[in-house]
C-alpha cells in the first residue's frame, strides 16, 4: 500500500511531463514561428496589463498574477501555451509515439510515455517547431513560463543562491518532470536551459534585479502615470538558442532498455535518410559555442559554472548518471 501511495504521488506530480522527438521530422520543411510567437506574446502581455490596471495603481503582484494566467503550463490552463499547441496559425510538427524515436519504449522505461493513452492526452509526445532556426519542442515554452517563474521567485524574491536554484531544478527534472521510470524516463538538460532562460524573461519584465548573464533586456513593463504600460516588446529570439534543442543539448535515458531503443530508432533514421544527420549533437562546434555564454562562475564548495548544471557534459545521448553535473 505504501508503495502504491508513493507511485500515485509521483505520477500525479509528473503529469506536466511530455517528451520531444527532435529527430524524426527534423529535415521536413517547417515555417519559422518566431514572428507570430513574438507578436502573440506582446498581445497577451498588453491584455494582462489591462486586467492588472483594473485592480489598482501599479500593483506588482496583481500584474504577475494576470500575466501568469496566460504564461503558464497546460495543466495550469495557461492560455498561450494552449494556443501554441492547438492553433493552426502556429506552424508545428506533430509526431505520434509509435513513429517517434521513443517507439521502442516499454512501460518500465517510462510509464507516461509508453502507455497506450500517451498519444491522446498530450502528456506523451509534444509538438516541435522551428523557432528562429532552432528546432525545439513546444514544451520549452511551458518550462520558460512555468519552471522559469519558480526559478525567478526563488532567486529574486526568496534569496536562494543561484546554485541552490539550479539544484532544485535538477531535482525537479529527475523526480517529476520526466527523468524517472514512473514519468517518461527521459532526463532533459535542454529543459533546464529553458527553465533558466525563463527566469531571465520573468526578471526582465520589470527588471527586478541584475541579469545573471549580464544582458539587461528589460524592463518590458513600467509604471507610467500610475498604470502599467508595455514600454518595450519582448522578443524570445533573445532567449532561445541551441541549448533548447535536444539534438544539440543531448538527453539522457534512465534505463538501459530506453537508451537502446532510442539508439535503435536513430540508427533506423540514418539508414532511411543517409543524406542527413541523426545524431547528438548535430554540430559540436555550435553547442560548444552556445555553452560558453552560460559559463558564469557560481562559487560554492564545488565551484563550477552555470553551464555545468544546464548542459549534458558528455555530448551524447546516454544513460542517466547520478550527480552528472559534478562529473
Region locations from a protein language model:
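Intrinsically disordered, low-complexity, mixed-charge
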Residues: 17-167, 178-192, 196-327
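Sec-dependent N-terminal signal peptides
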Residues: 4-12
Amino acid at each position: 500500500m505504501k508503495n502504491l501511495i508513493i507511485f500515485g504521488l509521483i505520477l500525479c506530480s509528473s503529469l506536466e511531463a511530455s517528451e520531444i522527438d527532435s529527430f524524426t521530422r527534423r529535415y521536413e520543411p517547417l515555417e519559422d514561428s518566431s514572428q507570430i510567437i513574438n507578436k502573440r506574446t506582446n498581445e497577451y502581455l498588453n491584455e494582462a496589463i489591462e486586467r492588472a490596471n483594473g485592480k489598482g495603481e501599479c500593483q506588482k503582484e496583481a500584474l504577475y498574477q494576470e500575466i501568469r494566467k496566460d504564461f503558464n503550463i497546460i495543466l495550469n490552463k495557461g492560455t498561450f501555451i494552449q494556443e501554441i499547441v492547438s492553433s493552426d496559425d502556429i506552424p508545428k510538427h506533430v509526431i505520434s509515439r509509435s513513429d517517434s524515436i521513443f517507439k521502442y519504449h516499454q512501460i518500465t522505461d517510462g510509464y507516461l510515455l509508453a502507455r497506450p493513452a500517451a498519444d491522446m492526452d498530450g502528456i506523451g509526445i509534444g509538438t516541435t517547431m522551428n523557432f528562429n532556426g532552432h528546432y525545439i519542442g513546444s514544451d520549452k515554452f511551458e518550462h520558460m513560463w512555468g519552471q522559469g517563474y519558480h526559478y525567478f521567485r526563488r532567486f529574486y524574491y526568496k534569496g536562494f543562491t543561484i546554485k541552490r536554484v539550479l539544484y532544485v531544478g535538477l531535482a525537479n527534472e529527475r523526480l517529476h518532470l520526466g527523468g524517472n521510470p514512473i514519468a517518461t524516463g527521459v532526463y532533459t538538460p535542454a529543459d533546464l536551459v529553458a527553465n533558466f532562460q525563463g527566469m531571465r524573461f520573468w526578471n526582465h519584465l520589470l527588471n527586478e534585479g541584475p541579469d545573471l548573464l549580464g544582458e539587461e533586456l528589460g524592463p518590458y513593463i513600467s509604471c507610467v502615470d500610475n498604470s502599467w504600460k508595455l514600454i518595450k516588446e519582448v522578443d524570445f529570439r533573445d532567449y532561445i538558442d541551441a541549448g533548447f534543442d535536444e539534438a544539440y543539448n543531448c538527453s539522457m535515458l534512465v534505463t538501459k532498455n530506453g537508451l537502446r531503443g532510442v539508439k535503435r530508432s536513430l540508427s533506423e533514421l540514418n539508414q532511411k535518410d543517409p543524406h542527413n544527420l541523426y545524431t547528438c549533437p548535430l554540430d559540436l562546434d555550435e553547442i560548444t559555442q552556445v555553452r560558453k555564454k552560460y559559463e558564469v562562475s557560481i562559487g560554492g564548495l564545488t565551484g563550477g559554472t552555470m553551464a555545468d548544471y544546464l548542459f549534458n557534459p558528455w555530448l551524447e545521448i546516454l544513460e542517466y548518471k547520478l550527480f552528472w553535473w559534478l562529473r
